[in-house]
Amino acid sequence: MALAPERAAPRVLFGEWLLGEISSGCYEGLQWLDEARTCFRVPWKHFARKDLSEADARIFKAWAVARGRWPPSSRGGGPPPEAETAERAGWKTNFRCALRSTRRFVMLRDNSGDPADPHKVYALSRELCWREGPGTDQTEAEAPAAVPPPQGGPPGPFLAHTHAGLQAPGPLPAPAGDKGDLLLQAVQQSCLADHLLTASWGADPVPTKAPGEGQEGLPLTGACAGGPGLPAGELYGWAVETTPSPGPQPAALTTGEAAAPESPHQAEPYLSPSPSACTAVQEPSPGALDVTIMYKGRTVLQKVVGHPSCTFLYGPPDPAVRATDPQQVAFPSPAELPDQKQLRYTEELLRHVAPGLHLELRGPQLWARRMGKCKVYWEVGGPPGSASPSTPACLLPRNCDTPIFDFRVFFQELVEFRARQRRGSPRYTIYLGFGQDLSAGRPKEKSLVLVKLEPWLCRVHLEGTQREGVSSLDSSSLSLCLSSANSLYDDIECFLMELEQPA
């Protein structure tokens, strides 16, 4: 009689497991904060600190053990202590990814930067309709459905998960294997995928505030960036196309309704936490863009675009826009600019922006479509004023979809940067110059109208890598000029000695 095949052990669900571990009282710093057990804290010490101990990683290790990921199967005893130390960063990353993906918890406070007691405070979410299942637990990615080539290649799904979302960064995996393996590990750790980006924005639209509500531009105050005015005919030499009419307005780029980012009100605790608990932290959508608009170096607008698509316009936004429509970003009026020549040219440029510049996130790429007569040049580089070289400036063709940023390229460069295989930090700041060629030799900050876009996901990943000690600074080229602490007293003493000498 043939034996029935042994059934695999049921997969451990993170939410139920974590609640049990909190109630066990076996972990220092992991505890409930209220009698109703709706609010708890998790110790969260940065692993680069010198006072890190085994207890600081105990809860992260416990999750790896519960998943069967530790200890590794080997003969001749357990792994050495140094092997466990090398795995701690990965344990913490997997724990963080599981904590976010389960949707059973919402972060109330982030005190991980507290030098005396680093921790985070979470509460149970009221969204009980989100039930845990094997698909929602994405702490460790399964075999990828299609791995992108290390250099370029057609877009395709990165991971095989379907119930996933972009996550905030954790430490990238230690370099092991070839460059392709490193890129795959980085993508797995960051939970970035084509359909993940779409799912984080495009599923089940929820009502939100009308675009622009509660988000106002910065007032035009302070001194204007200096510099002589432009020659009278300079503007029309490159800025405005000579086509007689803007032509028919293209159809919307999106093929389906896109969702607005999840409303913070949907992440309230299931039960009221203790009075000491503060409100939930409003973390931007993983694909959010930090938008800065500058008029000749002067910042006139800063806002976060959390929608999968947006349109840059000049003039008041349409009050009838729906939550599922592209988010509208309005250029502020240059009326308060003190330089009248700059004001006149800026106004002329902005009038030709209509019917707008459209941005849309498609999978791992950000696409742009210029619909107005005002020419727009784009490039990707470092922050303003940095010495990091930028990509060659390119003109956005009119009424044509153009990819201007690829997350896959960024993560490949980030892995090389972390492995010390790349001198400069990866570039992720996107510049859009309206009416002036960014490659003309002038500083970008001197452009009449400059839009700076920073993907939130890229910034936090790079900052996390830099906090691990990776830097683009070359110590061999640094020459620090410091005064001697005693130089002043030495000069005074020499002066007094000269006074005592006979003439």
UniProtKB/Swiss-Prot annotation:
Modified residue annotations for Phosphoserine: 471-472, 475, 477, 479, 483-484, 487
Sequence position, cross-link Glycyl lysine isopeptide (Lys-Gly) (interchain with G-Cter in SUMO): 444, 446
SUPFAM superfamilies on file: SMAD/FHA domain (SSF49879), Winged helix' DNA-binding domain (SSF46785)
Residues that bear N6-acetyllysine: 92
Compositionally skewed regions (Pro residues) per UniProt: 146-156
Region (Necessary for the interaction with NMI): 284-456
GO molecular function, one term: RNA polymerase II cis-regulatory region sequence-specific DNA binding
Predominant location: nucleus
Tissue: Expressed predominantly in spleen, thymus and peripheral blood leukocytes.
Effect annotated for changing residue 167 to A: Complete loss of inactivation of IFN-I production
Effect of residue 117 to N: Abolished IFNB induction upon Sendai virus infection
PANTHER family per the UniProt record, alphabetical: INTERFERON REGULATORY FACTOR, INTERFERON REGULATORY FACTOR 7
Family: Belongs to the IRF family.
Role: Key transcriptional regulator of type I interferon (IFN)-dependent immune responses and plays a critical role in the innate immune response against DNA and RNA viruses. Regulates the transcription of type I IFN genes (IFN-alpha and IFN-beta) and IFN-stimulated genes (ISG) by binding to an interferon-stimulated response element (ISRE) in their promoters. Can efficiently activate both the IFN-beta (IFNB) and the IFN-alpha (IFNA) genes and mediate their induction via both the virus-activated, MyD88-independent pathway and the TLR-activated, MyD88-dependent pathway.
Disease tied to this protein: Immunodeficiency 39: A primary immunodeficiency causing severe, life-threatening acute respiratory distress upon infection with H1N1 influenza A.
Annotated protein name in UniProt: Interferon regulatory factor 7
